[in-house]
Amino acid sequence: MIIRLRFYLSLTLCALSFALFSQEFSISGKVMDSNNTPVELANVVIFTEDGTTFFEGTSTDENGFFKLNNLLESTYLIKISFIGYEDFEQKIILSGHLDLKTIQLNETPESLGEVTVIAKKPTITRKPDRLIFNIENTALTEGSTLSVLKNTPGVIVSEGNINIKSAPATVFINNRRVQLTSDELMQLLESAPANSIKSVEVITNPPASYDADSGAVINIIMSKNLVTGYRGNAYTNYTQGVFPRYNVGTSHYFKNNKVNLNVNYNYTNQKINRDQDDVVNYLNPSNEVEEIWRSNVNRNTWSETHNLNLNFDYYIDDKNTLSLTSTGLYTPYFKYQIRNNTNITDANLNFLSRFTADNLSRDNKYNIGSDLIFRHDFDNSANLIFNAHYTTYDYKRDQDVLSNFFDQNNVFNDSSEFNTAANQVTEIITGKVDYSLPINETSSFEAGIKYSNVNTDSDITKLDIINGSEVIDPNNSNAFIYDENVFAAYSNYSKSWEKWDINLGLRVEQTRIEGESVTLSEINTQDYLNWFPNVSISHQILENTSIYGSYKRSITRPSYTDLNPFTFFLNENTVVLGNPNLVPSYRDHYKIGTNFLEYFTVEAYYMNYDGDIVELPRQNNETNVISYTPTNLDKKVDFGFDFAFDYYPTNTWNLYFVTSFYNISEEANFGEGFVELDQWSNYSILQNSFSLLEDRSLNVNFTLTWVGKNLQQLQTVEDRLFSELSVSKTVLNKKGIISLSVEDLFNMQDSDLRLGYLNQSSSSFVDSDNRFIKLGFRYNFGNTKLNTNERTTSAEERQRLKDLN
């Protein structure tokens, strides 16, 4: 199906390029109901033969009449739809002016009844720069948005991170970046229902219109709407993991000829558990084990979160639209407790001492981002978009840490206690202008400019408790002021002819940064200009065979918190450090691939990182302190080969399989020696999707994802198996939907990490709260055929917000 789509698309684009030399025809007809009454304002749309590419569209007049002009000789698919009627579809061969006479639409008692033929379009679509995962009307849409990403081919969600294979991914919704901290992003995706999602695009080669630091992109496409009216829903989910957690929410959408209004709210209450076993081998100058520290760490997180999203569109006239988007997240209650019990032995496992550390943190934060957007459409189909964005982010954390120390006889002999107070206020202002011009039927041009400013003011105060009184620790108290300005411009050109498609883009960014450590009286500045080209090309060799390739250069800037020189204590022997000397990381990404025999795809890729930014645990063998600090690797290379198979054994069963064999190598110089590590690994996914019962009202999805032993940030991560089963069933005349999902069926998603190079030797086993069962219910009311204008705020700079921890 994928190859056939590419073939027809190429033929169509080729035909359009010679439109001036070809004869044009028309299609006309009259739409009536079963009572022989004209159906006014019915949507009449012409697609390519396979129904995937839109050509022309119109609406019927008051007499039910329609006419589509300027059509070339070809085979088309015509679709006619109107609220309350079953859709009409017919394949037509156009070789002259065609009058379809009278077309009758039959009434249907269910407004959603027509959305059942899921198997007519493929689940997976591949393009030179992206993979499109279509999930509309599957069981996945009754889970959370995070669950959808976990089932998306190539995407790995683990330990609060979202990666496309080994590369961190940036999340967009309807081409607008989700601007939250990493923790907030996970909360949002877990609490947001997936019922409005149409597809997920995994973009490995984003065009130049994306910021250069976007890297690999996950773009969540929401269903679009052509119908006026009101729609709403209310939903709730209950999840049982180690502890119970629940989520409730409601969505409301209204549309008329002048206004689109969409409001979403949800509330999440959860307690998350995490158990961790750590082993650190502290070494002597000869790199022989001197002491072994074994720690059992239990982490519990309690939180209450409110999410509110507002989208408003005002259609001034046919050419001008004004939009307002606002996203707010408020966390009034967040408690984070760490209980640590560490036993210390010598190399022969003889007990030497132990200590306990209890860390209790309480957070309060809000994050509000808003966009004001104006769009003007020109008569030549070009458009001009102005976008202004503002974010305000406020974060506070109070922490209490108590450590008790025991001697060789396990007798208490000392204790220490300290408190910290951390604050961070961030403001982001951006403005951009984008211009898009269709040059002709086969080519288009895009260009744009952007300015962004980020200002962060943060401080931390450490208070030692001595004889019951708080005493400021000046060596670990500080204030940090950060200011960043980025000026950017881009252009993009795309062209299709005969059996070729090409896209060329270039982006330039000028960055100016100043970071001031107030207490240390240190100022660090960076000023650099970078060029970021990208290109993708595809060629249809045969009807069922195509080849493609792409290249993109991108940048990863350090987060504002990573550049902050603060020292944040988890306990007396474990700290998190910022690094004001971090520099940006650059990535060159090459890819070639082929689609053949309709069901198969083979790809090869190569990614070279210069200065990849990673957070490493570094042990000090003299002070017995573990420091987690971000640093730049000298070099990282990731290359591999992918094989994909997408097939429908029946019209109600889709089978998708992909396997990837890849190698990651990392190099770093820490002063005491040069480190070079590499590891071959395998990533495989097997996904089965079923639509059951006569009305296709029961949907089932089962996914297995295997991630073999691999290298991440100079650490070896052992094999893991991710699994998820999701089921959904429509009830109450298709107004209600019951969903059930189970994750980590085989209890194999936990992380087992090992680190060993130079004078570093440690391991960690992390048992996360990712094995659970979730039960959900959603009830729809109003005009359920409506789809929303849901989107999120767009300032890419918000993605680099991080909490102080």
Locate predicted features.
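Outer-membrane beta-barrel translocator/receptor signature
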Residues: D211-I218, L226-D277, S303-H306
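Short, acidic Ser/Thr/Gly-rich low-complexity loop/linker segments typical of extracellular
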Residues: E49-F65
